[in-house]
Design a protein with these regions (language model features):
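Flexible, acidic/Gly-rich N-terminal and inter-domain linker regions that tether
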Residues: 1-72
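Conserved Radical SAM active-site core
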Residues: 58-167
Length: 168
């Protein structure tokens, strides 16, 4: 049990093996520049991922489409909740160009949940896959999709774009 001294808790320090040094490498800076220049979002930033520096330094990122404001408020997620802006029609093309600039062979895409859209964003998902495929023929595309309110026809819309991997 921690000792209390003047209303302060005596907290043990983290063990050395649990500490990591965050280095801002040239690769990290390049990923950051590409994401910013193309007005993209990543779950790495929006979700406050503790592995962001490590991943971005290896030129990997999980792109987040359909904005950075979610219509749900899941306890496990750090993404902002509220009333999102309409989908950006330029986003699929910007995403595809970013993938090309980063030289990615495997692309991971997720999104906020968009219960405010009649199709939950399914057509936007399909457009993103198609744009990535047009500009990055050899890249594999992995999608981490929302539940689309359990509407199978919306999953069919996304699957028709032929991503390589679909997960939820």
């Amino acid at each position: 049990m921690p000792k209390l001294y003047d209303n302060k808790v005596d907290v043990a320090k983290k063990p050395g093996w649990l500490k990591i040094r965050l280095h801002r490498t040239a690769q990290f800076a390049e990923v950051d520049r590409i994401v910013r220049e193309h007005a993209l979002h990543t779950i790495c930033s929006s979700g406050m991922c503790p592995n962001k520096a490590e991943c971005w330094s290896r030129r990997t990122a999980t792109f987040m489409i359909l904005g950075d404001v979610c219509t749900r408020s899941c306890r496990f997620c750090a993404t902002r909740t509220g009333r999102p802006l309409p989908p950006d029609d330029a986003e699929p093309g910007q995403l595809a160009r970013s993938v090309k600039l980063m030289g990615l062979r495997h692309v991971v895409v997720t999104s906020v949940t968009r219960d405010d859209l009649p199709d939950g964003g399914a057509r936007h998902w399909a457009a993103a896959v198609e744009a990535i495929r047009r500009e990055n023929h050899d890249a594999t595309i992995e999608l981490l999709i929302p539940d689309f309110d359990a509407r199978p026809e919306l999953l069919d819309t996304v699957a028709a774009a032929k991503p390589d991997i679909i997960g939820h």
